Amino acid sequence: MNTALQCRDPVVVLEHVDLYPSAGEVPAGEWDFCLPVGRAAVRRAGSEVTVLSYLAMTGYVLEAVTRVGTVDAEVIDLRWLDRASVDWDTIGESIRKTNRVLIVEQGALGTSYGGWLADEIQRRFFDWLDHPVQRVTGGEASPTISKVLERAAIARTEEVADALIEIAKA
C-alpha cells in the first residue's frame, strides 16, 4: 500500500481474499517499506521450468512444487500486473535458464491475463523456448457461493502439480 500511496499515477490495489489469512516476512520496524515498482519476486530458484503466477496462486504453486518434488521449478511472483510494469528482465533471465514456461492463474481460460502474458512471452522469447508456453487456469464457470462449484471454477494445487509433471517430461 505504501508504494501505491507514493505513486503519482492512478493505482488499483488488488487484495485477494485468499491472502487474508496468510503470513509472510516483512522488514521489521520499517513502517514506510515500499515494494520496488515493476519488480517481480523470485520465490523459488530452479532450472527446469519457469512458473509465473500472482496473488494467491503463488502459494499454490510453491505447495505444488514441494508436493511433486521431482521438478526443479523456478517460481516467479509477478506482483505488478499492468503491462507497463511487467518485469521482463526477471522473466527473460529465468526463461533463458529453463527454456520452459508454465503460467498459473485462478481465473478462467478465456480472456485472462495469462493469455496475454503467454502471447507476449512467445513474441519476446521464442528463440529460448524448447516447449510451448503452458497454462493452468480455472474452469469456465465463475466462482460462486457454493464451495463445490467454487472448487470446480478455480485452479488449485492439484492442477498445478499435474501441469508441472506434464511440462517436465515433455
Question: Predicted regions span which residues?
Answer:
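Thiamine diphosphate
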Residues: V17-A170
